[in-house]
Each structure stands twice: as C-alpha cells, then as structure tokens.
Amino acid sequence: METAHPPMTTGRKLLGLLGWLALCFAAAAVGGLASVDAGSFYAQLDRPAWAPPGWLFGPVWTLLYTLMAVAAWLVWLQGQQRRHGHAPHTRAALLLFLAQLLANALWSWVFFAWRNGALAMAEVLLLWCLVAATTLVFWRVRRLAGVLLLPYLAW
C-alpha cells in the first residue's frame, strides 16, 4: 500500500530556495575568482560595437543567477510535490541544470584566467546548448521555470 507524503511546509520550501540561491551564487563565486582581473583584460579586447560595457556584467549576472536559482527551485518543488519525491523527469532536468551551471563557472576560467580564446569559444557553444536544453526541459516541467531562463539564454 502506498503512503501519501504530507504537503511540504513553507519552511522547507524556503530552505529549498535558499539552497538553490546558494548553489547558483557559489558557481558565480567560482567564476568570479577567475575574473578578478577581467576588467583590464576585457577593456583590451577588440570588441564589436554591440558588446556590452564592462560595468554591466555585475548587475546582469546577479539578475541571471537569481533567475536561474528560482527556475531550478520551481522544478525542484514540482518534483517534491510528486507522491514519491522527485519524478524522473525533474531529476533529469535538475541534473542538466547542474551541468550547465558547472559549464558556466568553467567558462570564466577558460577565458579570463587561462586566456584560451579558442577553447572558450567551444565551451560557450557547449554552454549555450546546455542552457537551451535546460530551458526546454524546465519549460516541460513548469513553464514559468523555462521562461525564467530565457534572459540567460539570450545573454
């Protein structure tokens, strides 16, 4: 006989959100360690006219990491609301999210710390594919979660 799980408490939901925020901003910190001298390096690059100014990266990435965390939290909540914990599709969606988050943190190291432009280009293409796939699977689990990743995909 199957037993029903009690509904998730507000406290547990908030702890989940804090956990996803902490994870996303930990990835940001890992990337940030590689980007300590990024300002001077970025200023020296030959950039197209449409490239954003260096000062814009901090505010934009703060917003993007927050949106990523909320999107992952919504998918996690969806999985938690299933009768037996995470449904297989929410687990797969969250694993894909973690893969793109790792690729995101790695890119700063490849480009800013190791200054390997060719590898950074290949890695950013992989990252974009991972973000696109994550956006799609998040959309299928919970539409709002997919929508929240669209600015990240566009950036």
What are the residue ranges of the model-derived segments?
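Alpha-helical transmembrane segments of multi-pass membrane proteins
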Residues: 24-40
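Interfacial loop-to-transmembrane junctions
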Residues: 136-154
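Short aromatic-rich membrane-water interface segments that cap or initiate transmembrane helices
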Residues: 47-60
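Membrane-interface helix termini and inter-helical loops of multi-pass transporters
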Residues: 37-49
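Structural signature of hydrophobic alpha-helical transmembrane segments
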Residues: 59-62, 117-126
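Membrane-interface helix caps and helix-loop-helix hairpins in membrane proteins
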Residues: 109-119, 140
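Helix-adjacent hinge/juxtasegments
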Residues: 66-108
